[in-house]
Amino acid sequence: MAHCLAAVSSFSPSAVRRRLSSQVANVVSSRSSVSFHSRQMSFVSISSRPSSLRFKICCAAMGEAQAKKETVDKVCMIVKKQLAVPDGTPVTAESKFSELGADSLDTVEIVMGLEEEFNITVDETSAQDIATVQDAANLIEKLVTEKTA
């Protein structure tokens, strides 16, 4: 496909779009999944389903950003519950467990709550590296990704 981009660089924008469209169609028809990447962090994946000729288009960067926010929100909820954080006390991604009053036993209980909520297993070494809500969310995202891979 790279040679096609070089060949169409001197055409008008509409000619380039037509040429790329036909190339994309050819690539998609020969593969079950194709991803397009740009420098602007807007990744698009096109997957064909074997049982139908329809295509599934998703914006991966947006999906990942949303998943991280959802993960952080769930971690905040679990931390608030485990530490009995008073209403009105903000718990954000940057919140440190120790600043919220957590001791080592509280941290173990938080990790157990995270394991239950996300259906993951956190090893002891990784659990000791968790100091903030964001640390926990990053570890969860990593473990969930590894589990589904």
Swiss-Prot record:
PTM: 4'-phosphopantetheine is transferred from CoA to a specific serine of apo-ACP by acpS. This modification is essential for activity because fatty acids are bound in thioester linkage to the sulfhydryl of the prosthetic group.
Lineage: superkingdom: Eukaryota
Cell location: Plastid, Chloroplast
Keywords: Chloroplast, Fatty acid biosynthesis, Fatty acid metabolism, Lipid biosynthesis, Lipid metabolism, Phosphopantetheine, Phosphoprotein, Plastid, Transit peptide
Stored InterPro entries: ACP (IPR003231), ACP-like_sf (IPR036736), ACP_chloroplastic (IPR044813), PKS_PP-bd (IPR020806), PP-bd_ACP (IPR009081), Ppantetheine_attach_site (IPR006162)
PROSITE patterns referenced in this protein's UniProt entry, alphabetically: CARRIER, PHOSPHOPANTETHEINE
Cross-referenced NCBIfam families: acyl_carrier, PRK00982.1-2
Name of the protein in question: Acyl carrier protein 1, chloroplastic
Annotated source species: Hordeum vulgare (Barley)
Gene name of this polypeptide: ACL1.1
